[in-house]
Amino acid sequence: MRKIAIYGKGGIGKSTTTQNTVAGLAEMGKKVMVVGCDPKADSTRLLLHGLAQKTVLDTLREEGEDVELDDILKEGYGGTMCTESGGPEPGVGCAGRGIITSINLLEQLGAYEEDKKLDYVFYDVLGDVVCGGFAMPIRDGKAEEIYIVCSGEMMAMYAANNICKGIVKYADTGGVRLGGIICNSRKVDFEKEMIEELCRQIGTQMIHFMPRENQVQRAEINRKTVIDYSPEHAQADEYRALAKKIDENKMLVIPKPLEIAQLEKLLVDFGIAN
């Protein structure tokens, strides 16, 4: 079983990318579980066709300790298993703790047992790794491969670099490695070349360049992944290609994060900062 976490700046398209890629893996016959690690609880919406899933934390609050796996794990598109950790009420408590509680509960209830025959577990994790709870999938060895969703915008690259620092911090203890950067295009000038250069300097690969396409939004409005909503569309093939690349990926590295000056120089070199 491969344990993968998807990180990236808030709003970059992690949940969309994760669900569409998972749909591609499911189409290939892979058994996948998706664990949403975001208080918004939107990491499985497209796989479940818009069913607002009751989160692990909500279930615990309402049911107490008497929780069954079926209460928190729902089957979605292509036989994918979906769960959302959820979070505390706004303004109260720590969302990072929610992730820790949820993953521990899933383990206790046997979600990862061999009889489940899982090929993949995907953790879709909120934003930057600035809070210890959100770093938990990296820190405790729950995730072994990290893919960062990025774009050619400065803050997305800054966040990607920060996440690499988090990977370095826990590479020895948790055994986590960076599998690559997924460029989710925002149509910035020289975006592909810039992210390729960022990857080269960090010591990783741009595993896929995902073009910007309105079909993704159309599918989302219909509460589906692109592969589910319009399987013949070119964008569905892009997600299939990404799924195949992840499935075949052997390049797992400890990244070399850049200094801020190096990151800014990269932006200047490609004319973004002018």
Swiss-Prot record:
InterPro entries: NifH/chlL_CS (IPR030655), NifH/frxC (IPR000392), Nitrogenase_Fe_NifH (IPR005977), P-loop_NTPase (IPR027417)
Cofactor comment: Binds 1 [4Fe-4S] cluster per dimer.
Entry binding sites for [4Fe-4S] cluster: 94, 131
Keyword annotations of the record: 4Fe-4S, ADP-ribosylation, ATP-binding, Iron, Iron-sulfur, Metal-binding, Nitrogen fixation, Nucleotide-binding, Oxidoreductase
Reactions catalysed: N2 + 8 reduced [2Fe-2S]-[ferredoxin] + 16 ATP + 16 H2O = H2 + 8 oxidized [2Fe-2S]-[ferredoxin] + 2 NH4(+) + 16 ADP + 16 phosphate + 6 H(+)
GO BP, one annotated term: nitrogen fixation
Residue sites binding ATP per the record: 8-15
Residues with PTM ADP-ribosylarginine: 97
A single MF term (Gene Ontology): nitrogenase activity
Gene3D superfamilies: P-loop containing nucleotide triphosphate hydrolases
Record PANTHER family: LIGHT-INDEPENDENT PROTOCHLOROPHYLLIDE REDUCTASE IRON-SULFUR ATP-BINDING PROTEIN
Similarity remark: Belongs to the NifH/BchL/ChlL family.
Name of the protein in question: Nitrogenase iron protein
Organism: Solidesulfovibrio magneticus (strain ATCC 700980 / DSM 13731 / RS-1)
Gene this protein is translated from: nifH
